[in-house]
Amino acid sequence: MKKLKLHGFNNLTKSLSFCIYDICYAKTAEERDGYIAYIDELYNANRLTEILTETCSIIGANILNIARQDYEPQGASVTILVSEEPVDPQLIDKTEHPGPLPETVVAHLDKSHICVHTYPESHPEGGLCTFRADIEVSTCGVISPLKALNYLIHQLESDIVTIDYRVRGFTRDVNGMKHFIDHEINSIQNFMSDDIKSLYDMMDVNVYQENIFHTKMLLKEFDLKHYMFHTRPEELTEEERKVITDQLWKEMREIYYGRNIPSV
């Protein structure tokens, strides 16, 4: 896409939001409580603040304010307000390619925020537990928040990820013409590194004319030992392993497709 010479500030708003899910099987009520306590501590407000602060570093944002809170009985939220310093838009890389992990990208934001909320959950029957984190990176300025996507997926290693990216508003060039997007994109996947893409099955649902992009990700490899909490698969009978595997796989597919799947 040809670089634009703008009249004034870039008024486009670019929002990246995604849900990450971690799935676990806990055999007893005590194990379920233990998993919820473990995941709640692993993703407490302090750790989430560290992750979001590093996200700001990656996209070059300047932190104005941090609000964070842990909740009882579980859950946490963090919101960071960020601002922009002067930057030459001609120096910003707007091509479609994966963003860095912890390295810094020279870019700055204005009237923008980054926030995360967590939702640990379990059911009293069946042993299935899920952890969901909702993350939103919303920016006004010359850079897409997709540059932070790689880092966030690596930090929040997840079984299922659903991602939405949209560009809203418009900005004008020096001739007065409105522009409703200022960078090329045909898939969120183009902003992911090869190692991430090799781990997940992915599908897109995009509405190009509305500048709305959606990608779903489901972990390819399934190893039961990674989903058991305080129980080893070899401690179970073959029939128990099959039942639990079927339960977990069904749960993951239902979350991935966003609908209940009838039991066969």
Swiss-Prot record:
Cofactor(s) needed: pyruvate
Keyword Flavoprotein: no
Sites annotated Cleavage (non-hydrolytic): K111, S112
Cleaved signal peptide residues: none
Active site: S112, H117, C140
Cofactor-binding details, from the entry: Binds 1 pyruvoyl group covalently per subunit.
GO cellular component entries: cytosol
Catalysed reaction, written as an equation: S-adenosyl-L-methionine + H(+) = S-adenosyl 3-(methylsulfanyl)propylamine + CO2
PTMs per UniProt: Is synthesized initially as an inactive proenzyme. Formation of the active enzyme involves a self-maturation process in which the active site pyruvoyl group is generated from an internal serine residue via an autocatalytic post-translational modification. Two non-identical subunits are generated from the proenzyme in this reaction, and the pyruvate is formed at the N-terminus of the alpha chain, which is derived from the carboxyl end of the proenzyme.
NCBIfam families assigned to the protein according to its UniProt record, in alphabetical order: SAM_DCase_Eco (TIGR03331)
Annotated function: Catalyzes the decarboxylation of S-adenosylmethionine to S-adenosylmethioninamine (dcAdoMet), the propylamine donor required for the synthesis of the polyamines spermine and spermidine from the diamine putrescine.
Family: Belongs to the prokaryotic AdoMetDC family. Type 2 subfamily.
Protein name: S-adenosylmethionine decarboxylase proenzyme
Organism, as annotated: Cronobacter sakazakii (strain ATCC BAA-894) (Enterobacter sakazakii)
Primary gene name: speD
